[in-house]
Curated annotation (Swiss-Prot):
NCBIfam families: PRK03699.1 (NF002982). The keyword Membrane applies. Its main location: membrane. This is Protein TsgA. GO terms for molecular function: transmembrane transporter activity. Keywords: Cell inner membrane, Cell membrane, Membrane, Transmembrane, Transmembrane helix. It comes from the Bacteria. Belongs to the major facilitator superfamily. TsgA family.
Length: 393
């Protein structure tokens, strides 16, 4: 594989995470405007975004098999057509049913693209380089989370319709589509089987269950928190721009945290530092919810920084629970995290309807506490130390 080809594939991976990050994170910024557009209460409108999350979950789950049947390049190019159709559906329809269908299609497209992006990084890089590349790739999710709420706030403040935010997100997929030209993708399925030796089956252990629960609770807690921060902030009397700035501050700090921890983590036992980070994140989130308006930006900045390495560390620890990293094990933990994404508004929507945005934030805080408990319990059963021991010579 040429270096030019490797760079193109790596950038496709980066942008695939940016696409999903933009679609998921911008929800909290545009939800109120979309609710007004369809003349619905915000809590009811939030339920329709479950279609986006369901599309992401289904596509990530199915693409483990789909990647061996349909070539990756074909998937990405067909995804571009679906993306254009979905954005057009958002722009030209006033039907709630078509809006939900378009959201589901956007979820399918982003889930397939992100699973391809993850696969490409694991194929292109080995060992420690793979871990650092995955963390850097994941930072594009956060980068999109920093940029697109600002784009949304800019457009909405000028009375530009909310669907233009999704048109802007579509430009990310346009870049992916352009990169597929003149680019060779790794072979999969029957074409790749002859070069792969059979891998002995290995029991996962109870530590994987702890990590799966932690992944689900972390993503559900994180998205439940960040999706309702704008509504919570507006309820305190903050402007739309200031509310959007809180979300952008979180993801900017999250992005810098990922870059910092890609160096820091190698000096510590992963399970121990993960437990410390999960505990700190739970405390910082509580301080944000109960603090004054003046302190909120500082708490959300530190929360973003210290929580940035949690999810990638959960996945990395999962891959270290067996001697040979199991793609199915990693996919299982990723799927649990994606279930957390799908449940975001299923869980928080009714809470907001009955108790308000602050109750949703406190629920997210409780989920972060569960992550801390799972990471602490993992310390008694984790196999990562014995499996990584032979490698340190």
């Amino acid at each position: 594989m040429t270096n030019s080809n490797r760079i193109k594939l790596t950038w496709i991976s980066f942008l695939s995470y940016a696409l999903t990050g933009a679609l998921v994170i911008v929800t909290g910024m545009v939800m109120g405007n979309i609710a007004d557009y369809f003349h619905l209460p915000v809590s009811s409108m939030s339920n329709t975004f479950t279609f986006l999350n369901a599309g992401i979950l289904i596509s990530i789950f199915l693409n483990a098999w789909l990647m061996e049947i349909v070539p990756l390049k074909t998937q990405l190019r067909f995804g571009f057509i679906l993306m254009v159709l979905a954005v057009a559906g958002l722009m030209f329809s006033h039907s709630l049913a078509l809006f939900s269908a378009a959201m589901f299609v956007l979820g399918l497209v982003s889930g397939i693209t992100m699973s391809i992006g993850t696969f490409l990084i694991t194929q292109l890089y080995e060992g420690r380089q793979r871990g650092s590349r995955l963390l850097f790739t994941d930072s594009f999710f956060s980068m999109a989370g920093m940029i697109f709420p600002m784009v949304a706030a800019f457009l909405l403040a000028r009375s530009i319709e909310w669907y233009w935010v999704y048109a802007c997100i579509g430009l990310v997929y346009l870049a992916i589509f352009i990169l597929t030209f003149g680019c060779e993708f790794p072979a999969l399925g029957k074409h790749a089987q002859h070069s792969q030796a059979p891998v002995a089956k290995e029991k996962w252990g109870i530590g994987v269950l702890f990590l799966a629960v932690a992944a689900l609770c972390y993503i559900l807690g994180q998205l439940g928190f960040i999706s309702w921060v704008p509504e919570y902030a507006k309820g305190l009397g903050m402007s739309l721009n200031d509310a959007g700035a809180l979300v952008s501050d979180f993801w900017m700090s999250y992005m810098f945290g990922m870059w910092a921890f890609s160096f820091i983590l190698r000096f510590f036992d992963l399970q121990r530092i993960l437990t410390v980070l999960a505990g700190m994140a739970a405390v910082l989130m509580y301080l944000f919810i109960t603090g004054t308006q003046a302190h909120m930006p500082w708490f959300i900045l530190t929360l973003g920084f210290f929580s940035s390495a949690i999810y990638t560390s959960i996945i990395t620890l999962g891959s270290q629970q067996t001697k040979v990293a199991s793609p199915k094990l990693v996919n299982f933990i990723l799927t649990c995290g994606t279930i957390g994404t799908m449940l975001t508004f299923v869980v928080t929507g009714p809470i907001v309807a009955h108790r308000g945005p602050q109750a949703a934030l406190l629920t997210a805080n409780g989920l972060y506490a569960v992550v801390f408990v799972m990471c602490f319990a993992l310390g008694f059963v984790s196999r990562h130390r014995q499996h990584s021991a032979p490698a340190t010579h």
